């Protein structure tokens, strides 16, 4: 009666088209290029650890992963955050994924690894720089593993392809915005509206952010706005396609409705 799908927006659009052609319902999750905004009043230590996990957890291979990290504030604050984040990323232990002492495992396949390497090259061609390079990482005892180390790109701007498209790997882009307004404009201007997060101690900034960003999942001092249990989950625009969307629509997708009109004599 219907199709549910999670993957790239290109495939989701094709499946949506086919579902409509044959009169089937469709629920689709597409690509993402998620942003996290770090305000100058954020708890830096906790923010760094949250964003480290939000970026490099699952080796960055999840639609909820944070890809673009934007600091809002002075140049001094941006440099302080950048240095702290790079140090945290550098401390990640990469290795065999079932080893409990390991923080980050390999890419899922050679094709995925090569795709991430291509995106890094695209970023360099666009004018970004590498502040932490994980391309040549070697893991002892696993010479043929599809490993990449944590990578941090700096001098990134929102018009670059590496900021607009989904990298799907352990690459973090660091950007600097002049204001929260500008940061929100960058998020809403992206073609993918899956998830976004803000780190701040200000309730006013948090409320403004969650109200104005056009994404399906919002985190406030949470890097991964991941649904737990029966929480809804969704995206907007090219990140969330189909007839059904989060909350009540989720169970309606799996339910057939019937209207019965009765008269007793």
Positions of PLM-derived features:
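Short catalytic-loop micro-motif centered on adjacent basic/acidic residues
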Residues: 2-5, 195-197
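Proteins with a high burden of low-complexity, intrinsically disordered sequence enriched in S/T/G/P/A and R
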Residues: 1-3, 72, 189, 202
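ALDH superfamily catalytic-core signature
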Residues: 2, 8-157, 180, 220
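Conserved C-terminal structural/oligomerization subdomain of aldehyde/semialdehyde dehydrogenase
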Residues: 37, 87-93, 120, 140-265
């Amino acid at each position: 009666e219907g199709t549910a799908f999670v993957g790239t927006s290109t495939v989701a659009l094709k499946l949506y088209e086919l579902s409509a052609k044959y009169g089937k319902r469709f629920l689709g999750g597409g690509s993402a290029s998620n942003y996290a905004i770090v305000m100058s009043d954020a708890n830096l230590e906790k923010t760094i650890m949250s964003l480290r996990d939000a970026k490099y957890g699952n080796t960055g291979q999840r639609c909820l992963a944070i890809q673009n990290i934007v600091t809002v504030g002075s140049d001094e604050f941006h440099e302080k955050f950048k240095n702290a984040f790079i140090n945290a990323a550098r401390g990640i232990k990469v290795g065999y994924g079932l080893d409990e002492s390991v923080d980050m495992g390999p890419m899922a396949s050679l094709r995925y690894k090569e795709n991430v390497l291509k995106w890094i090259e695209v970023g360099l061609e666009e004018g970004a720089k590498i502040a932490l390079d994980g391309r040549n990482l070697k893991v002892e005892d696993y010479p043929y593993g599809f490993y990449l180390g944590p990578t941090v790109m700096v001098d990134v701007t929102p018009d670059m392809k590496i900021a607009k498209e989904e990298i799907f790997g352990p690459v973090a882009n660091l950007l600097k915005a002049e204001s929260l307004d500008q940061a929100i404009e960058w998020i809403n201007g992206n073609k993918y509206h899956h998830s976004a997060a803000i780190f701040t101690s200000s309730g006013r900034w948090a409320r403004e952010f969650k109200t104005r960003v056009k994404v399906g999942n919002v985190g406030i001092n949470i890097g991964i706005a991941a649904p737990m249990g029966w929480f809804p989950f969704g995206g907007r625009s090219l990140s969330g396609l189909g007839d059904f969307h989060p909350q009540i629509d989720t169970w309606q997708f799996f339910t057939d409705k019937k209207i019965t009109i009765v008269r007793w004599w």
